[in-house]
Curated annotation (Swiss-Prot):
Residues 114-269 form the Thioredoxin domain. This is Thioredoxin-related transmembrane protein 2. GO terms for cellular component: endoplasmic reticulum membrane; mitochondria-associated endoplasmic reticulum membrane contact site; mitochondrial membrane; mitochondrion. The thioredoxin domain lacks the 2 redox-active cysteines, suggesting that it lacks thioredoxin activity. A motif (Di-lysine motif) lies at residues 292-295. The chain crosses the membrane at residues 103-125. Coiled coil: none annotated. Residues 126-295 are cytoplasmic. The keyword Lipid biosynthesis does not apply. It comes from Rattus norvegicus (Rat).
Amino acid sequence: MAVLAPLIALVYSVPRLSRWLARPYCLLSALLSIAFLLVRKLPPICNGLPTQREDGNPCDFDWREVEILMFLSAIVMMKNRRSITVEQHVGNIFMFSKVANAILFFRLDIRMGLLYLTLCIVFLMTCKPPLYMGPEYIKYFNDKTIDEELERDKRVTWIVEFFANWSNDCQSFAPIYADLSLKYNCSGLNFGKVDVGRYTDVSTRYKVSTSPLTKQLPTLILFQGGKEVMRRPQIDKKGRAVSWTFSEENVIREFNLNELYQRAKKLSKGGDMSEEKPGNPTPTAVPDGENKKDK
């Protein structure tokens, strides 16, 4: 079962993964990830390259290059143990493959290493990771609307994600959060998002650090009666996030979503709150002047 479950998940994710991989960002990232393999293996490119092989074959890996590639495989396997989505697995492979490529190119020739490093920098500056653009029941806030919405109707329970576009963890969590909003959104239980990378005063006001060192992104906060009730991840005394996995199961369990949903449904039936049926996606509500691509 330990092997079967990931295989089933991979097969289930093939259509979505193929669309994700077909985007320019992923294609270019894959090309950079196999750059050294192409240079070392494809003649006439490999002809004349320096090598430490005893047979002097420049178009095959030497023992040190094999060691580096094996070490890369071990690192990827260790990092992927905490990955939730297939996109996270592929993203880890891309990232560590580029690091290994840079080491291999610098070892081969410092000029080739500098050229590869320049290409990676240009890629990072010009290509942005694909954002999740699927169906969701999520309202996007700005620095003004978040406080107004939380105070507008205190009977409504809000779960708000504080995110930043540059965070890979936030991008990986986006489809999971969208699925949760489709399953649990109703008139008494709403889902929201705010870009603290864009609205820095919001991050200060709600004490969500945007520093990569604190690992506080993404942060989920539960609001009831306009007040914060709980958040994940929790913060230790040094201001760093306590390790927490943003999986669908963890969010449902930690935030008691099933109980919150049933309570919100009873509230909507007993009061004058309009009923919304989760599972049927509607256009995402965003503040004036913003759209999901801005996120």
